[in-house]
A protein has these predicted regions:
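Conserved P-loop
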Residues: 2-72
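Residue-level signal for inorganic ion chemistry
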Residues: 17, 50, 79, 119, ...
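Residues at the starts of beta-strands that form the adenosine-phosphate
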Residues: 28-31, 76, 113, 152
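Structural beta-sheet core signal
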Residues: 32-34, 80, 116, 155
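Short, flexible active-site-adjacent loop segments at beta-strand->alpha-helix junctions, enriched
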Residues: 36, 64, 83-84, 120-121, ...
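Short, hinge-like loop/turn segments at secondary-structure boundaries
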Residues: 48-51, 78, 132-134
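Helix-adjacent hinge/juxtasegments
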Residues: 54-100
Length: 165
């Protein structure tokens, strides 16, 4: 089963997704695919919070770019934290949008149980630069693709989740 947790920054989506997959996995230790790359001290601090929270509850894999290739190797439930940062990394490495969406589509066809975390950035103001607008547009397309393929979708805000699908 594929499940999407989508919400704004600091909405609680990561914590809710982690609790959800741990509950669903029951006896299996789920994989935690961390897609973030460290570019500054502030991002390192955010990553540290996530690492401390998950402790040894997950088998952690850090891979910022090769999502499909990495997920093919997982033999159990997996949490992808987060699709938004993976999209950011793809744009940083100048991967064409069509290739990015094709890879995400392939990920969604994998048969493993998967929980995807994604930032809802389309509710914000229109960005003032081309790259930021490109990211927001790509993020929206990715969210629609995940929404279509996931059996469950939760919108997160204020530390709460609302089932959308």
């Amino acid at each position: 089963m594929k499940t999407l947790f989508i919400g704004g920054i600091k909405s609680g989506k990561s914590r809710l997704a982690e609790a959800y997959i741990l509950e669903q996995a029951a006896t299996d230790k789920p994989y935690y695919l961390a897609t973030n790359e460290v570019f500054d001290d502030e991002m390192q601090a955010r990553i540290r919070v996530h690492q401390q929270r998950r402790e040894d509850l997950f088998v952690t894999i850090e891979e910022p770019v090769k999502l499909f290739e990495t997920l093919q190797k997982c033999r159990g439930p997996v949490l992808v934290e987060c699709v938004s940062m993976w999209l950011n990394n793809q744009l940083y490495y100048q991967i064409p949008e069509a290739d990015i969406l094709q890879e995400l589509g392939a990920v969604l066809q994998l048969t493993c149980d998967m929980v995807l975390v994604h930032n809802e950035v389309g509710l914000s103001v229109i960005a003032d630069n081309r790259l930021a607008r490109q990211f927001v547009d790509l993020s929206g397309k990715a969210a629609q693709l995940m929404g279509q393929h996931c059996e469950q979708v939760f919108f997160c805000s204020a530390g709460l989740k609302i089932k959308m699908k």
